[in-house]
């Protein structure tokens, strides 16, 4: 998108009050049964924002009981027309759009996310995803099947029931919507556990669900699930061939790693560059990383915020030290930044080899590692030599090479001459240890429905 086409970004709200800090069950706010609370912090300043009620087993039981009750045959939720269900989900999208500035400010304060990214990318994505799911609500249907014999056979797509949904801290609002949008569209009820580091936007959305005013259930809690879809971690390969548009590859690979301080499951964290362009690619990547301005993510002009918390911050610094000790060349960064908040300098390593910790472990931080390859077969083998398989990138002007490599890579998503492009229309999920099942798109709806086959004996079929 060109700068001239960028929408205006408002100024973040100041003196934000966090009024929703309780557990939301059966359209009502509750204190925890135990009386326990936990603090929620701003990772840029380390200040406490508020305290949130801490859900425990008894709270979970209450939430699941309420969600089961709402799913009973004959309940208002089960007897509601599918088109009305879609209208309610669209209404929730309207309310999120209304509160977009508030939610973006909250997401930035609680999660360390750049305000501009929260406002444009995260909130924009949430609204589009909900509207996409709303459109599916009255289009989830079965088929008639020409079974042998005098039978009439059809299938029904039925909701599976109560869905337990656990939200990660790196994209708390986006992941909440990815979970509840398709689940509710299919007619399920949900029990949601936001991440303890970033619960505030989920709790605000609960208040909007109450405002919508229908039988949609949410709560902070855990559930034992009989059926599981998991979108887990990754150590995603990004392969740059010598015939690629070098500047475009540098920029996409850079954003593929450094977006949201590297705290993305799809981060392009194993960067393979063909030998003949390796040195130039490293040079341009280092120049790009050095342009960052670090600081409070609510401040205009800042383009890198803090890591989520102290634990993650220390883990990343430890992995950076391992890279230095194991012989990778530190090109820039390599340490903490500032005297307050969990900031880490944008870091680039070259001369990285496959056996180093930084090449094998998911860092989840602003640490780019650039490796060299010589041949097509070699890089495919190395790219697939991992327990993960969430995503991958390929940069080449050769369409035959792009198709060959994308077919060979063991990844749920492969981007060619781009990286990190996601849409509500397209399925997302991983191979191997990066999870099972899919989210988004029509495939994502399948995770929230059961197929029932109904066969009726008839006197004579007329086929």
Model-derived regions: residue spans:
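ALDH superfamily catalytic-core signature
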Residues: 208, 212-353, 382, 416, ...
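Short, well-ordered beta-strand elements within core beta-sheets of diverse protein domains
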Residues: 48-55, 72-76, 165, 238-241, ...
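Hydrophobic face of amphipathic alpha-helices that form TPR/SEL1-like repeat modules
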Residues: 1-45, 70
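Conserved C-terminal structural/oligomerization subdomain of aldehyde/semialdehyde dehydrogenase
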Residues: 45-51, 293, 320, 325, ...
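Residue-level signal for inorganic ion chemistry
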Residues: 46, 85, 107, 187, ...
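Glycine-rich loop-to-alpha-helix module at the N-terminal edge of alpha/beta enzyme cores
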Residues: 49-140
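Rossmann-like NAD(P) dinucleotide-binding subdomain of oxidoreductase/dehydrogenase enzymes
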Residues: 141-248, 373
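A short acidic/small-residue loop/turn micro-motif
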Residues: 31-32, 37-38, 54-58, 244
